[in-house]
Amino acid sequence: MNLAEICDNAKKGREYALLGNYDSSMVYYQGVMQQIQRHCQSVRDPAIKGKWQQVRQELLEEYEQVKSIVSTLESFKIDKPPDFPVSCQDEPFRDPAVWPPPVPAEHRAPPQIRRPNREVRPLRKEMAGVGARGPVGRAHPISKSEKPSTSRDKDYRARGRDDKGRKNMQDGASDGEMPKFDGAGYDKDLVEALERDIVSRNPSIHWDDIADLEEAKKLLREAVVLPMWMPDFFKGIRRPWKGVLMVGPPGTGKTMLAKAVATECGTTFFNVSSSTLTSKYRGESEKLVRLLFEMARFYAPTTIFIDEIDSICSRRGTSDEHEASRRVKSELLIQMDGVGGALENDDPSKMVMVLAATNFPWDIDEALRRRLEKRIYIPLPTAKGRAELLKINLREVELDPDIQLEDIAEKIEGYSGADITNVCRDASLMAMRRRINGLSPEEIRALSKEELQMPVTKGDFELALKKIAKSVSAADLEKYEKWMVEFGSA
């Protein structure tokens, strides 16, 4: 007799009982008790035989408990006579593996749309522009004989009244309230996600917060800001640019420039990335692109900033391109052309400007490159720009009187704006690191604020420069300059 098999069967019986599989558990309990009984017949030692009998008795008690649980569960399944007779027609047989048919909904008119109510008249007047195409709502209850309208009909009617409904909402909105986007025809969750995660009104970034980049600021003012200030001038051949592409190494301030543009223009700022316009459901990504541009037109004047646009609209026709990615690119290109077409017949002050930034301009699709008419280069900061950036980053930090920011600016040549910010942050922490060196956690907590507010010295910057190297190589800069010579449009 294999003792390991007895132990394994007893273990499985207990595990099945714990998992609720009582039928299998009872089978294993019965088998292991028979095995123990046969094993006891072959044992000659009375002491060992008594122990096996004790084990069999314990397993028998467990078996009786499982059997009691099964009988209790079976008692719940006993059919009790109903209080009232039920015919076979009332309760037809239902296959548990098949979903039951939906319960028919009773269509009733909401109580707030009754004729005596005078408060809903402004809403009905607001929708009067849609009444020429057909009835949108019903004032009387829908009878059961009438066929309810399908979701496809509602979608067509909603899309047909999108532009008029939104224009009426903009005209009827009070001065103190921000008009709300009417997402009729779209999933409510998609609209709320874009409103919550993308829309950023009046970012508090100004031109003075950005060091250097005077040429880029001048070009952005001409391409984006001036059409807002002089709408009568920018008409016809002087129409505003459809899009602006900012090209440059990482950390040079492209996102900061986009936020400054939105602040100076007083526009609604949409910050879009590849995750924003991506959905696992077929066709949802294209709807998100279209919804984004419709919301941008509604909240116009609007700045749509697409960061890392090469991840959304890379070159088409490659072997590793997916069908869904191609559809998203096509919808984005169509909507960008649609923005320009809408501006020609609309108020120039209601423009939608597309700002894009990329670190890989050579991967962008040719059609998108054509739509982004202004392509400007955001270079590394100059010596003057590095000194200004040091002043901006260290304006809240106490500096040693002997420190010369111009000397430090010469040492960080080739550093990007993000690299310089990291150097300033690391240097400002050096004094704190020296102060808490060797102290226990209790002593660190007991330190006063004045003890930690020590000035930053030149030696702190030297230590920080030894630890932090520049992140942009000369070969990368040469690639950007070569691309700008071939495709730049500054």
From Swiss-Prot:
InterPro entries: AAA+_ATPase, AAA_lid_3, ATPase_AAA_core, ATPase_AAA_CS, KATNA1, KATNA1_MIT, Katnal1_chordates, KTNA1_AAA_dom. ATP binds at residues 248-255. It holds the Pfam family Vps4_C. It is found in: Cytoplasm, Cytoskeleton; Cytoplasm; Cytoplasm, Cytoskeleton, Spindle pole; Cytoplasm, Cytoskeleton, Spindle. Signal peptide: none annotated. Keywords: Acetylation, ATP-binding, Cytoplasm, Cytoskeleton, Isomerase, Microtubule, Nucleotide-binding, Phosphoprotein. It catalyses: n ATP + n H2O + a microtubule = n ADP + n phosphate + (n+1) alpha/beta tubulin heterodimers. Residues 116-127, 143-169 have a biased composition (Basic and acidic residues). The modification Phosphoserine is found at residue 174. Its main location: cytoplasm. Expressed in testis, restricted to Sertoli cells (at protein level). HAMAP family: Katanin_p60_A1, Katanin_p60_AL1. Belongs to the AAA ATPase family. Katanin p60 subunit A1 subfamily. A-like 1 sub-subfamily. Interacts with KATNB1 and KATNBL1. This is Katanin p60 ATPase-containing subunit A-like 1. It comes from Homo sapiens. The lineage of its organism: Eukaryota, Metazoa, Chordata, Craniata, Vertebrata.
